């Protein structure tokens, strides 16, 4: 099982997302269930290492958001067109 420490995003929009990517992070969203959607930011290198394993897509992933654990599954992944970079991930609560 995979566990990822994440931070809640404070800024939204294209400029904020670009600043995240320059800082070797990328935006993501957690949605589904009874709770409201949450915009988060993840460290690119740690997620890229996990993402290379097939279990990342088939098993539940644990996100630690502000000290609270949330079980999610990967719903969608957006990648950079030609660089080996992740651009955005959608997580669905389980």
UniProtKB/Swiss-Prot annotation:
InterPro entries: Rbsml_bL25/Gln-tRNA_synth_N, Ribosomal_bL25/Gln-tRNA_synth, Ribosomal_bL25_short, Ribosomal_L25_dom, Ribosomal_uL5_bac-type. One of its GO terms (biological process) is translation. The lineage of its organism: Bacteria, Pseudomonadati, Pseudomonadota, Gammaproteobacteria, Enterobacterales. Transmembrane segments: none annotated. The keyword ATP-binding does not apply. It comes from the Bacteria. SUPFAM superfamilies: Ribosomal protein L25-like. One of its GO terms (cellular component) is cytosolic large ribosomal subunit. Pfam families: Ribosomal_L25p (PF01386). Belongs to the bacterial ribosomal protein bL25 family. The keyword Glycoprotein does not apply. Part of the 50S ribosomal subunit; part of the 5S rRNA/L5/L18/L25 subcomplex. Contacts the 5S rRNA. Binds to the 5S rRNA independently of L5 and L18. This is Large ribosomal subunit protein bL25. GO terms for molecular function: 5S rRNA binding; structural constituent of ribosome. This is one of the proteins that binds to the 5S RNA in the ribosome where it forms part of the central protuberance. Keywords: Ribonucleoprotein, Ribosomal protein, RNA-binding, rRNA-binding. HAMAP family: Ribosomal_bL25.
């Amino acid at each position: 099982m995979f566990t990822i420490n994440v931070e809640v995003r404070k800024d939204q929009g294209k400029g904020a997302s670009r600043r995240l990517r320059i800082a070797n992070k990328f935006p993501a969203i957690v949605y589904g269930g009874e709770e409201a959607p949450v915009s988060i930011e993840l460290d690119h290198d740690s997620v890229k290492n996990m993402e290379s394993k097939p279990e990342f897509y088939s098993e539940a992933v644990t996100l630690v958001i502000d000290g609270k654990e949330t079980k999610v599954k990967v719903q969608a992944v957006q990648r950079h067109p030609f660089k080996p970079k992740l651009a955005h991930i959608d997580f669905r609560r389980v």
